Amino acid sequence: MMDGVMSHGLELEIVSSSFARNEHRAQTVSGNAEQTLDRTDHGDRNRISLLSPLIWEGDSAFDAWLTASSVQVAPVLLTLPSSFAQLGLASGIGLQVLYGFMGCWTCYVITALYADYRRIKESHNTSYQNHTIQWHEVLQGLLGPRWMALGLFFNTTYMICLAAIQMIASGSIAFYINDHYSKRTWTMIFGAIFLLTTLIPTAHNYRLWSFLGILMTTYTSWYLTIAAVTHGQALNVKHTGPKKLDEYFMGAANILYTFGGHGFTVEIMHAMWKPKKYKLVYVYAVLYIFSLTIPSASSMYWAFGDGLLNNFNAFSFLPKTKFRSAAAVAMLMHEFIQFSFCSLPIHLVWEKLLGLHHSRHFYIRAIARIPIVLFLWLISLMFPFFGTINSVVGSLLVSAAVYIIPCLAHMTYYWSFMTRENAIEQPILCRGSWRAMFLVDAFVVLWVTILGVGLGGWASMKNLIQQAHKFGLFSTCFNCPKKP
C-alpha cells in the first residue's frame, strides 16, 4: 500500500504544485505568527529566534512522525498487558495489527479531505494567518453545518476524555513511585502542574516535546519487556485467554483506543509545510508503535498471565527498583506532553468560541485556556478508573470520532462524480477504483460500529458501572493495594 501511495504522490506532484506553494506560504506566515507570546515584544524576538529552529519550530515530516509516534500510546503501554489477558495472545496481536492499519486508512481519508478543503479555500484567497484549521472546519467546508456539528461534538468530547485520562494515569503512575500519597492526591498535584501546558501555542511548537515523548515511551516499553522476561513466569501462572464476552470486547475496545491517536490529524497536518506527506508519516508511526506495544504486552502476559486481570497498571506487577522508578518518571514526563497535545484541540475550539483565536497577544489566549484545564482536572478526579475508562472512550468516542465519521464523510463527499474528478488524492486501490475505496470505508464503518460501539460499548459501560458502584465517584485510591 505504501509503494502505491508514494508513486501516486509523484504523479500528482505537478498537479498540486500550486497548492503546495500556497500552502508553504500560508504555513510560514501562520507559524511565524504563533511562535511568540506577544508580536509587539520586539526585544525578545531575536533571542527566541536563536533557539526556535532547534526546539520550537516543528513543521517537517520528521517532526510530524515524532508527534504521531509520541502521542499514540502513552499510558496504554501500561494497560495493554491486561487487554492481552482479556483477549488471549493471538487475538491481542491480531487486533493490534488490524486496528493499526484501519487507523492508517482513516488517516489517509482525513488527509484527502483536508487537501481538497485547503485547495477550495485557497482558491478564494482565504488567509490562515493566526488560524489553525481543525477537523470540524474541514467537515463544514466540504459537507455543511450538520457534519460540522457532528464532528465537533464527537472529536471535542473524545479529546476531553483523552486529556482527562492523562491526568488519571499520572496519579496512578506516581503512586508507584511514592505510595505515601493516594492516587487522588497525586492527580491533584499533577493537575496543577498541567496548567503549564496552556503556554504551548499550536501543534507547530512541539519539536522538543515530541522528541522527549518518544524517548520516554521507548524506554518504558523496553523496560516492561526486559523486566518481564528477567522476572520469569509467576508461580502457577495460567494463560486461560478469553473467559467472558464482556472481558473480551472490553479488551478489544482498549486496543481500538490505542490506535485512535489520529484524532488530531488535521492540527498536525496544518503545522506541516507539506501536509500531503502525513498519510505516509502515520504509517511509519504505526509500524514503530507496533515495535513498542507488541513485545511489551506479550512479555508481560507471558510472565503474569491471568493475574493481569486484577490490575490494569503493569507497574503493579513488577518489583520496585530504580529501573521501574525511572520508567514511571519517564511516563509522567510523557503524560505532561500527551496532555498538552490532547488538550490543544479543545483550547483552539474554546478560543474560537470566545473570539480570541486570532488575538496577536498570546498571553490572553493562554489565560483563557485555564478554565479548560480546571474542567479536565475535575473530570479526572471524578472518574479515576484507570484502564476501565480507556475502554469506554475507545468504544464510544474513538469509534465515532476517528473511524466512523471520517469514512462516512469520505464516501459522502466523493460520491459525486465532479468531486471525484477534481480530487487531489485519487484512489490508491485496484488501479484507481473509487468503488474499492468505498468498500474499504464501508468495512471500517460496519466493523467499528458492531464490534466497537455495539459490543465494546456494552462491555465497557458494564465494567465502568461496576467500578463506580464498588469504588464510588471521586475515589481516593482506585485499585490500590491494601496496606498491611
How does the language model describe each region?
Residues 201-208, 385-389:
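Membrane-interface helix caps and helix-loop-helix hairpins in membrane proteins
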Residues 56-58, 112-155, 159, 164-186, ...:
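Membrane-interfacial loop- and helix-cap regions that link adjacent transmembrane helices
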Residues 75, 100-112, 191-199:
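Central hydrophobic cores of alpha-helical transmembrane segments in multi-pass inner-membrane proteins
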Residues 83, 196-201, 378-384:
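Hydrophobic alpha-helical transmembrane segments
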Residues 1-56, 62-63, 67, 117, ...:
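Intrinsically disordered, low-complexity terminal tails enriched in acidic/polar residues
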Residues 81-125, 129:
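Extracellular loop-to-transmembrane helix junctions
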Residues 76, 190-195, 372-379:
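Hydrophobic, membrane-inserted alpha-helices
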Residues 59-78, 191, 254-261, 450-452:
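The first (N-terminal) embedded transmembrane alpha-helix
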